[in-house]
């Protein structure tokens, strides 16, 4: 009897409030002129949701377990660093990343003009295909009120 290798899917969510005086990093890009996001690392919600989706898909934990506030070496770390480390952990665990789809939710920054650049930056950091979309909540909730930014990611992984 043969056993089929089935893909696994993970979902990740990340939310950060805006924080004046910090640079704004979203999808591994700096967004000059935009208010930054509070967080232990750079607050990159797109990168963080992506890491969380990959870690849960591969049963390697979640964002808080792997990069939590109890890990001083990740204080101020960029989303690109977290993506690269997540990819390394998956490879060591015997997983291959199929792809990731991430959606940024909020009024600002406006992602459309830099979508391809953001996808390329995230894909390069991760070493796998990342697609990016963005939406607003039409004035509803914390993102609609302009209090912060959120992201939801879905990741597909398979055994190496």
Swiss-Prot record:
Site positions for Transition state stabilizer: 40, 136
Alphabetical list of InterPro entries matching this protein: MECDP_synthase, MECDP_synthase_sf
Keywords, ordered alphabetically: Isoprene biosynthesis, Lyase, Metal-binding
Gene3D superfamilies in the record: 2-C-methyl-D-erythritol 2,4-cyclodiphosphate synthase
SUPFAM superfamilies: IpsF-like (SSF69765)
Record GO terms (molecular function): 2-C-methyl-D-erythritol 2,4-cyclodiphosphate synthase activity; metal ion binding
UniProt family annotation: Belongs to the IspF family.
Full protein name: 2-C-methyl-D-erythritol 2,4-cyclodiphosphate synthase
Organism: Frankia alni (strain DSM 45986 / CECT 9034 / ACN14a)
Lineage: Bacteria, Bacillati, Actinomycetota, Actinomycetes, Frankiales
Gene: ispF
């Amino acid at each position: 009897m043969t056993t089929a290798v089935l893909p696994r899917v993970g979902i990740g969510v990340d939310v950060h409030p805006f924080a004046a005086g910090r640079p704004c990093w979203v999808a591994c890009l700096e967004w000059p002129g935009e208010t930054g996001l509070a967080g232990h690392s750079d607050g990159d919600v797109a990168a963080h949701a992506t890491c969380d989706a990959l870690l849960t898909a591969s049963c390697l934990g979640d964002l808080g377990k792997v990069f939590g506030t109890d890990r001083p070496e990740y204080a101020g770390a960029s989303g690109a660093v977290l993506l690269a480390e997540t990819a390394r952990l998956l490879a060591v665990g015997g997983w291959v990343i199929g792809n990731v789809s991430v959606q940024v939710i909020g009024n600002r920054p406006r992602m459309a003009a830099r979508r391809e650049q953001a996808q390329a930056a995230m894909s390069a950091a991760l070493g796998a295909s990342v697609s990016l979309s963005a939406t607003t909540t039409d004035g509803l909730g914390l993102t609609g009120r302009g209090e912060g930014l959120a992201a939801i990611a879905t990741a597909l992984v398979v055994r190496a």
